[in-house]
Amino acid sequence: MKTVTVKDLVIGTGAPKIIVSLMAKDIARVKSEALAYREADFDILEWRVDHFADHSNVESVMAAAKILRETMPEKPLLFTFRSAKEGGEQAISTEAYIALNRAAIDSGLVDMIDLELFTGDDQVKETVAYAHAHDVKVVMSNHDFHKTPEAEEIIARLRKMQSFDADIPKIALMPQSTSDVLTLLTATLEMQEQYADRPIITMSMAKTGVISRLAGEVFGSAATFGAVKKASAPGQISVNDLRTVLTILHQA
């Protein structure tokens, strides 16, 4: 299986990499939170642009991205606008969503973009090609904050992302029971062993799914999300605790 290298970070080998989400509402908070995050122990900085009040103003968005880039130049920067339909803060039209991601790609400030699988097949394929032409990696994602589908459906979605040339397919699902967590882990293992030719990220959310955020190295998930301050999704634990557990499991 091939790995994905962003800056000096190799994703897809060793312990799962830790991603943290910055969810500031304005430029001033972007700056103050970036300074606070700089002291934390993580690998990838995700900027959740759907929390940014002025997200429709591309100049303002890129000014904030520049602050993040300058504050943490060594950290890979993942640009994410999570749509309302997948659990994000803001609704956005497909056209505006694609335009915003293209502007991020054009800026030269971001290393990776998050692209939602169900944006529309043609738009997704075109945006992936555009990102790759500009040396930007694509995390292709799908989120369900209500349920966990069958393992076959989870695998089908991850394989579709792979067929669309995502650098890293990602899926996050809400368990209704402990058996749903097992379904997610089973699907992750099967995908990793039988189909994946690149790193994947999977997680089962909420308190019930916490084990999935810790056991990625065992089942085949290459990264996990931790919280520096406020969690960006239910079930996230602090980066310090997360690093401790991931290191213990890696060294066992």
Swiss-Prot record:
3-dehydroquinate binds at residues 21, 46-48, 82, 213, 232, 236. GO terms for biological process: 3,4-dihydroxybenzoate biosynthetic process; amino acid biosynthetic process; aromatic amino acid family biosynthetic process; chorismate biosynthetic process. Pathway: Metabolic intermediate biosynthesis; chorismate biosynthesis; chorismate from D-erythrose 4-phosphate and phosphoenolpyruvate: step 3/7. Pfam families: DHquinase_I. Keywords: Amino-acid biosynthesis, Aromatic amino acid biosynthesis, Lyase, Schiff base. CDD domains: DHQase_I. It catalyses: 3-dehydroquinate = 3-dehydroshikimate + H2O. Gene3D superfamilies: Aldolase class I. One of its GO terms (molecular function) is 3-dehydroquinate dehydratase activity. The active site is at 143 (proton donor/acceptor), 170 (schiff-base intermediate with substrate). Its EC number is 4.2.1.10. It comes from the Bacteria. Coiled coil: none annotated. NCBIfam families: aroD (TIGR01093). HAMAP family: AroD. Involved in the third step of the chorismate pathway, which leads to the biosynthesis of aromatic amino acids. Catalyzes the cis-dehydration of 3-dehydroquinate (DHQ) and introduces the first double bond of the aromatic ring to yield 3-dehydroshikimate. Homodimer. Belongs to the type-I 3-dehydroquinase family. This is 3-dehydroquinate dehydratase. It comes from Escherichia coli O8 (strain IAI1).
